[in-house]
Amino acid sequence: MYHPRELYPSLGTGYRLGPPQPGADSSFPPALAEGYRYPDLDTPKLDCFLSGIEAAPRTLAAPPPLPPLPPALGTEPSPPSAPEGLHSLPGVSLSLENRELWKEFNSVGTEMIITKAGRRMFPACRVSVTGLDPEARYLFLLDVVPVDGARYRWQGRRWEPSGKAEPRLPDRVYIHPDSPATGAHWMRQPVSFHRVKLTNSTLDPHGHLILHSMHKYQPRIHLVRAAQLCSQHWGGVASFRFPETTFISVTAYQNPRITQLKIAANPFAKGFRENGRNCKRERDARVKRKLRGPEPAATAGYGSGDAPGGPCDSTLGGDVRESDPEQAPVPGLPLPQLLPAVAPVLRPTCCTLPLSTGPPVTFQPGIPASRRLQTLPSALLSRLPGAAARASRLRIPSSSTLSILCLALPPRGPLPTALPWAWGLPRCGLQTNVLSLCSLPPGLLPPHFHYPFPHTK
C-alpha cells in the first residue's frame, strides 16, 4: 500500500491522514489547525460501546420452590422388614385384615398375573385403620414398588435371580374410589383395594399399575390427610408396608402350588375347578356348540330365485370324526330309517327349505324343542314307508321354513350316490364333506312344496 504523499509529491509533506496537530510541521496556520482538531480521535475510546456491560457478571435467580410432595411418595423402596409407616400422622395404625391368607401364599411364593388389559390382584390388600380424626378428611392410596434390583426366573421348583432388573417404569398410584372421606368413614369398616389391576402395557390408558414381568414387587398403602385431592397443603401422610405382601409378577403361573391355592381360595377362580365353567366337560360342550353355530338369519321377503344361507355358510372344523365301516349308513333306506342309523357317526346341522307362502323363519338350535318343533305333516308321513312307527322321532320346526337335517360325512368318504335321494346333490365348500339333504324324492313331497329348491346348486 502506497502513502498518498509518495504518489503525489506535489502535495508536499504536510499531507497527513490524521487531523493536523498543533505546533507540528503543517501547511495550515496554528489557529486554523487548532480549529480543525478532533480531540476525540486522538485516542480511541470504546466506553460508548461497553456502557451496557456491567463489570460484575450477573447470576441467574433460583426458580421459585415447588410445593413439596408427601415424603412417602418420593422415597426409594427399601427391603421390607416389618410393617413400617411414617410418623407424620401420630397415633395412626394400619393392620392387614387377610394377613393369614397372605402368609399362606407367601410361604409358597406369591405370584400375580399381569396382562395387557389388566388383571386384579388376589389376594387383595384389605386393611383396617385406627387413630384417625373422625372429622378430618383423608385419602387412601396404593402403589406397587420393586423390592430389589433383580430379575427372577422359575428354575428347579423355586425362584432364582437371573440378572439385573429392567429400568423402572413410571410410577402410578391407585386412589381409592371413596377418597377423600372422613376418618369416621375409613374407620367404620375395612378398606379393600380389590379393584387394583396390574398390567404389563406401558401404553395403558386406564390407569392400571404398570409392572415388569418376572420382577418382585410389594404394595405400599399411603394415608394422606388433605382437604381435597389436588390440595398443595398436606396435613400429614403415613405409609405402610407389610412383608407378607411381596409377590412376583408373571404372565402365567409358574408354581403349580400357587395355582392350587388360587383355585382353593379365590371364589372367582371357577374356570379352573372341575365343576366350573372351564372344566374339560364344559369346554368340550361349548366348543361343540360353537362349531355347530346358529344358522344365519334369513332375509325376509326374498324372491323366487333367492334363498337364505344354509349350512355351507358355517364351518364344522376338525371336530367331525371319521366313521367306522361298521357304523356307515346303509344305502337304500328311507329317510326315517336312515337317521337313527347315521346319528352315532354323523353330525347333524340344518338347512332351510322355503315353502311356497309365508315369511321365512330361521331354525334356532338354542330354543328348546318343546317350543319350536312339531311332528311331520300327515301329508308327508303318509308317503314315507314305515313313518307311522317313527313319527315321534322325526320333528321339524313349527314355521313356514322346513329344516331338514344335513349329514356331515367323513372327510375321505365318497358320496353315497347309491342313495336315490342323494342324486344330483353337490358337496358344500366346507373343511369336511357335507351332503346337504335339501331334496327329497319327488314321490315323497306334498304338492305344496317347491321342487327343485332354489338354494341347491
Curated annotation (Swiss-Prot):
Q: Which UniProt keywords apply?
A: Developmental protein, DNA-binding, Nucleus, Transcription, Transcription regulation
A single GO cellular-component term from the record reads: chromatin
> What is the annotated localization of this protein?
Nucleus
List, in alphabetical order, the GO biological process terms annotated in this UniProt record. Answer: cell fate specification; positive regulation of DNA-templated transcription; regulation of transcription by RNA polymerase II
The domain of life for this entry's organism is Eukaryota
Residues in the DNA-binding region are 101-274
PROSITE patterns annotated for this entry? TBOX_1, TBOX_2, TBOX_3
A GO molecular-function annotation: RNA polymerase II cis-regulatory region sequence-specific DNA binding
Principal subcellular localisation of the protein? nucleus
Per the record, where are the segments of Basic and acidic residues compositional bias?
Answer: 272-285
Please list where the region (Disordered) is annotated.
Answer: 1-31, 60-90, 272-334
Q: Name the InterPro entries on file.
A: p53-like_TF_DNA-bd_sf, T-box_DNA-bd, T-box_sf, TF_Brachyury, TF_T-box, TF_T-box_CS
- Compositional bias (Pro residues) at which positions? 62-82
Q: Quaternary state and partners of this protein? A: Forms a dimeric complex with DNA (in vitro).
This molecule's function is given as: T-box transcription factor that plays an essential role in the determination of the fate of axial stem cells: neural vs mesodermal. Acts in part by down-regulating, a specific enhancer (N1) of SOX2, to inhibit neural development. Seems to also play an essential role in left/right axis determination and acts through effects on Notch signaling around the node as well as through an effect on the morphology and motility of the nodal cilia.
User: What name goes with this protein?
Assistant: T-box transcription factor TBX6
Native source organism of the sequence? Bos taurus
